[in-house]
């Protein structure tokens, strides 16, 4: 199942939590949305064993209140110490129970579900759930993960090659991303693909990224800016003819090689078409 925000709102997240029966593992960059916190609180009252793990120092943010509110739910709570270093983050956005996993682009705050373009994907694939469970348990316990990763998952550190394979797939690709950044392998792949690439970024993009835009435009990459008052592009997606990517990864060196990030590759034609249609609608609203 694919959910598109802000249209879908917070309901899919709350529903996922409400459906948990025995346990629920949540790993997000930060969590402050009240309906989600309330759903967690009710899940614990039902007897669900809830574990929540967040980043310890999200960029330009204090988590003092966030930590307090999460602990008040009664959930088991940890800062991801494996990625609690300078300029390194636990930027993942996923949760899972014993039979379902949700992977997406949204931080669990009010803006994600009311103002942002975000995508969330749910799956019942047992192998994907098993991989995510092992990753979560390792990070939660502060142990380096060295296990098997399902081939449909895009997990950082070490996600560069899978992102390059998304860019290099035959045919045109459509990208929505909050930022670009100077990471030569990604920029070279985009430049090489040239006019077969369309990219939507928020109009509030940094001056540094504006230089990257000018570089890519020299290679005929088509780039448009989405006015922030319309919808804020926080999503990270790559949509092609054969497959699509949704995940937490930005296309930067740190995101792909240092952070904990989680994404998913989708091969379902119906969902790919849904993503394409949303991109085309967004493209028409850009400048």
Language model regions located:
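Class I S-adenosylmethionine-dependent transferase superfamily signal
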Residues: 40, 187-190
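Long, repeat-rich segments with strong aromatic
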Residues: 177-179, 184-188
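Charge-patterned, long linear interaction tracts outside catalytic cores
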Residues: 278-287
């Amino acid at each position: 199942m694919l959910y598109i925000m802000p249209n879908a709102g917070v309901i899919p997240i709350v529903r996922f939590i409400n459906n948990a029966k025995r346990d629920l593992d949540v790993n997000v960059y930060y969590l402050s949305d009240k309906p989600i916190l309330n759903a967690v609180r009710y899940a614990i009252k039902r007897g669900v064993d809830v574990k929540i793990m967040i980043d310890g120092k999200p960029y330009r943010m204090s988590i003092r209140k966030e930590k307090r509110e999460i602990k008040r739910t009664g959930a088991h709570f940890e800062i991801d110490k494996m990625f609690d270093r300078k300029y390194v983050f636990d930027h993942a956005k996923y949760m899972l129970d014993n039979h379902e996993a949700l992977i997406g682009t949204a931080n669990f705050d009010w803006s994600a579900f009311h103002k942002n373009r975000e995508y969330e994907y749910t799956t019942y694939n047992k192998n994907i759930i098993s991989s995510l469970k092992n990753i979560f348990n390792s990070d939660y316990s502060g142990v380096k993960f060295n296990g098997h990763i399902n081939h449909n998952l895009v997990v950082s550190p070490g996600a560069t090659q899978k992102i390059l394979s998304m860019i290099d797939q035959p045919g045109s690709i459509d990208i929505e991303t909050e930022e670009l950044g100077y990471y030569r392998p990604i920029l070279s792949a985009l430049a090489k693909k040239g006019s077969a690439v369309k990219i939507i970024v928020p109009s509030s993009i940094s001056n540094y990224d504006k230089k990257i835009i000018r570089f890519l435009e020299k290679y005929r990459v088509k780039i448009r800016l989405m006015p922030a008052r319309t919808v804020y592009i926080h999503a990270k997606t790559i949509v092609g003819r054969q497959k699509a990517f949704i995940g937490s990864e930005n296309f930067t060196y740190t995101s792909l090689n240092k952070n904990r990030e989680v994404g998913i590759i989708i091969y379902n034609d119906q969902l790919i078409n849904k993503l394409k249609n949303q991109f085309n609608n967004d493209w028409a609203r850009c400048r």
